[in-house]
Amino acid sequence: MCVPHSPACLSGRAFLHAAGLPPLRYTTSSFRFGPIMTATSTPILLHRFHSPLGPMFVCASEQGVCLLEFAVSQRNEREFAELQRLLHTRIIAGENDHTRQAEREIGEYFAGTRQQFEVALHLPGTGFQRQVWDALQQIPYGDTVSYQQQADRLGNPAAIRAVAGANGANRVSIIVPCHRVIGKDGSLTGYGGGLQRKAWLLAHEQRVRLGDAQPQLF
């Protein structure tokens, strides 16, 4: 059931306004995508969809989802460029089974009916980054860990800055849940989608875990 003035009832534009975020002023056609890197490379497909926290982009290769982000302009352009470089191909507008499954599962996450994701992922990065991203996916729904705890779990307590950097390089929001990592003192720290969204996601998971799947706008 839709609760008036709750995020589920707000359009992306309304949420951005309520959260004090700038309006989205672009679509997929606004981005400058690079040239095809090889004659036989398969393009990455990019699909834009709406969520209770505003528009999101999902990118997928033939292997799986390689990007899932809130629409935040400069960060998106930087990540698109990096993704094209890493996969030696270009991004074009389109959908495949992976983008459709990701959109469906994210919708279920926001509805409070999904806590684990099944969509295939394709995460190009360094060995250390992939290790950090794998560890992020082991953080239980509704829980949080500090950067120090994350480094400890990786067996490298001194690697806090490196861990934070790998978290920041994560291109798959929510599914690879970097929003569950907080400061040692419990404070919210940087999040590519903005601290308002990070707070919302954490509160949403707590409410769902406690049996209340009707989120309130902060």
Locations of regions flagged by a protein language model:
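Basic nucleic-acid-binding alpha-helical/helix-turn surface characteristic of O6-alkylguanine DNA
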Residues: 15, 20-158, 204-218
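Major-groove recognition helix of helix-turn-helix-like DNA-binding domains
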Residues: 163-169
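Major-groove DNA-recognition helix of helix-turn-helix-type DNA-binding domains
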Residues: 171-175
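…primarily DNA-binding HTH/wHTH and HhH modules…
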Residues: 184-218
